[in-house]
Amino acid sequence: VQYDIIDNNLIIIQKRCVIMNKLQNYLNDYVQKLDGDWSYLIYNLKNPQETICLNENHLHKSASMIKVLILATLCASDLDFNEKISIDYVPHVEGGGALQEMDSDTKVSIKALASLMIVLSDNLATNILIKKLGMHNIQAYADKLNLKQTKIQRYMMDFEASKQGRENYLTVNDYHKLLCHIYDNRHLARFNIAWQILARQQFRDRIPYYWDEDIIFHHKTGMLDFVEHDGGILEADFGTYSIIIFASNLKSNAIGGREMVKLGQYIYNYLAQK
């Protein structure tokens, strides 16, 4: 009987690997016809044999995806999550978020700043945390995690730094390692907070756009001019998957975003096959 169980498990694994190979062939053919530079990675955390990717080490401007690195660094730090910081701690910036609408004397806890940084992609909250942690410490944490191509070199919305060549960079491979680091440490209180924050992401207009609302995707989105990114970890009854898509050098954000929505729908439906 034990041999029968082993044989059945091998058959299931082989079937899933065939499904993944077919998915990879489809995705490769599809994205290579698209405008811009596309990278993707899909990885089964319970069965690493189910891994497919394309251009996984291609360097992209990180946009807001770098905020997940800041979140992980915060969890590993000794900063008190309950400490409150004035929102005037750094200069106010444009872009997404809620803090810029608040009175200048408002104080917000570090935990709330982390939530705003991810859930609403709040740039002011992000910059406060970058300054509080120290940009060099965030980079050092990336290096510690062996995120070989990851660079954090500027604050959010610092276009002058960008013009000078100081940019934030990620690959889908490094971002995948970062997600797995948070996932693997979610049993620790501080990392569990990060894990739950990622699940409350409000921007579901890319990879999970056509997924049911009750499907939890622990993820982050990122956007700059001609850049569209999304990536996270899906926990489903058919498996736990890291699903990441980065797109840069697009001719149009709108078109790139629509293509990512299509890819997200196709990937989910394909993985859900029995």
Language model: regions and residue ranges:
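Structured C-terminal helix/loop/strand segments within mature extracytoplasmic catalytic/sensor domains
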Residues: 15-34, 51, 132, 183-205, ...
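Acidic helix-start/capping segments at beta-turn-to-alpha-helix junctions
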Residues: 84-96, 133-134
